[in-house]
């Protein structure tokens, strides 16, 4: 700090690095993809005769034009999948808010580690849900027709990958990369 007689004050400036901005964008994209995955009607589809989402399961017999739908919230594994996915999404939302607030606050560095830890925790929860879902689906639902995991399931994987990328970016120490800025 400069002496009081010189009239100069030391001002600390915290530089926002591009890595953290890209990390925040990754977190935002993960949130958007999670929202799309949770609301998606198509996690599993089968030849326009069956579809399964996180909320309902619908079948249409080949001879009829009427869909018969029932809630999936009666099955333990589907509730567990939904809870893990929503838990991960909630953690991602908190990490996004902390990351966004850290941009507005002068001391950003102290928020980097908590955001990264939250994102890694969210990734673990979401990977567990995304591994549990196909295993239990194949184990419990017997379809005699070709079925495929559809775009809702893919969006959930996309959210998990973007969360992992954001966590990695928040782990990088900008002090080691000052030459690049």
Swiss-Prot record:
Interacts with CTNNB1, CTNNA1, PRKCI, PARD6B, FYB1. It comes from Homo sapiens. Expressed in adult brain, fetal brain, cerebellum, heart, lung, prostate and thyroid. It is found in: Membrane; Cell junction, Adherens junction. One of its GO terms (biological process) is cell-cell adhesion. The keyword Acyltransferase does not apply. It is a multi-pass membrane protein. Regulates cell junction organization in epithelial cells. May play a role in the transition from adherens junction to tight junction assembly. May regulate F-actin polymerization required for tight junctional localization dynamics and affect the junctional localization of PARD6B. During podocyte differentiation may negatively regulate activity of FYN and subsequently the abundance of nephrin. The chain crosses the membrane at residues 21-41, 83-103, 115-135, 152-172. Keywords: Acetylation, Cell junction, Membrane, Transmembrane, Transmembrane helix. GO terms for cellular component: adherens junction; cell-cell junction; plasma membrane. The keyword Membrane applies. This is Transmembrane protein 47. The modification N-acetylalanine is found at residue 2. Belongs to the TMEM47 family. InterPro entries: P53_induced, PMP22/EMP/MP20/Claudin.
